[in-house]
Amino acid sequence: MEKHLIALSVAALQAGAAPASADIKMGSLYPFSGPLALLGDESARGLEIAVEEINAKGGVQGEKIVLVRGDAVDNNQAIGEARRLISVENVAGIFGSFSSGRAVAASQVSELAGVPYFELGAVADEITDRGLENVYRANPYARDFAQMIVEMLQKKIAPKLGRDSKDLKIAVIYEDSSYGTSVAKHEETFLKEAGLNMVLSQSYPGNTVDMSSLVLDLKSAGADVVLQTSYQSDSVLFLQQANEGGYKPSAIVGAGGGYSLQPTADAVGHDVIEAAYDVDFTQFAVNTSFTPGLEEFVEAYKKKYGETPRSGYSLTNYVGAKVILEALNKVKGFDAAAVKQALSAVDIEAGKTAMGYGFKFDQNNQNERASMMGMQWQDGKLVTVYPDAAAISEIRLPQ
């Protein structure tokens, strides 16, 4: 990010960082418009439910939390909205952001102002790898995607195919933002460490409108397995054009994004997405004995929004926000020292949250207990197939 985009007056921002009323204002910074609006809005819904539940129990430090929205339609807008939330709205902290690019950009502004930034869904490495003191991430990150994908490929997918995983020809394709490049980099590393055969690694613009040449490249490489990191529009485009081009690999594995969305399956057709895999945050067709509180969240979501959750991103944001807000309720103030004290004390074991994973923030303010799950599209629904403790179905082969 260019330095001139974030050159701010530190004093001016810090002067505006204290709440101006008895209520505690918190920023809700997501892409509410533009190409990422669907998942941005879905993520924000989880935060909103968490805040409602916290407020119903007395709020945080005796005060109600009030969310102030910021529309991070792109990276520059994320910077501008972060400035506004801090210096005009006087927020005590910012929650976000779904998009890695937006999170990286906006969190620099927040760090400069000394205002905590709580990331609940973006996965790029650099969000918590830059040594920033006031940036925390509750969710899994890019490395976790890649590790789970390669593990599932070796332990579940290859055996189901009746193949040795080392005999498979694997292609890595990804949109070229921070999200795609971070996940792909780790996929390449884990594939190499496992001794697997990567025959192609290729990026593409996230806003591309034609992937037919990429489909031809995959065919030419003889790829048996395709690992795609993508948002919704490029997930839909690839699946459609692969189908139209008669390209049917033995397995397609998505890394969240569009592969976790019911609207993606509906757009391409359930027969087209059938048997495609997805590694992502916890989704809803899961063994709920491993995810206590998930069913209650779904009911709260339906009551508030009049429909079932559109993706597990709402659940991820809900669980992360509740853990953070409950921790902040145990300290006084929202300065850097108070936030560090609160989140350093968080210690939740796996199997105790609606996500299934636990919470403990490491030296980089990353939740080191966050983990992914493996899903597969079956009969138009995304169901959990890995790990075994969370699975509700065996994996299927494409017809």
Swiss-Prot record:
Pfam family, any one: Peripla_BP_6
Keywords: Amino-acid transport, Signal, Transport
UniProt-listed Gene3D superfamilies: 3.40.50.2300
CDD domains noted in UniProt: PBP1_ABC_ligand_binding-like (cd06340)
Keyword Cell inner membrane among UniProt keywords: no
KW Transport (keyword) present: yes
GO annotation terms (biological process): amino acid transport
Signal peptide boundaries: 1-22
PANTHER family: ABC TRANSPORTER SUBSTRATE-BINDING PROTEIN, LEUCINE-SPECIFIC-BINDING PROTEIN
Record-stated family: Belongs to the leucine-binding protein family.
Its job: Component of an amino-acid transport system.
Entry protein name: Leu/Ile/Val-binding protein homolog 7
Species lineage: Bacteria, Pseudomonadati, Pseudomonadota, Alphaproteobacteria, Hyphomicrobiales
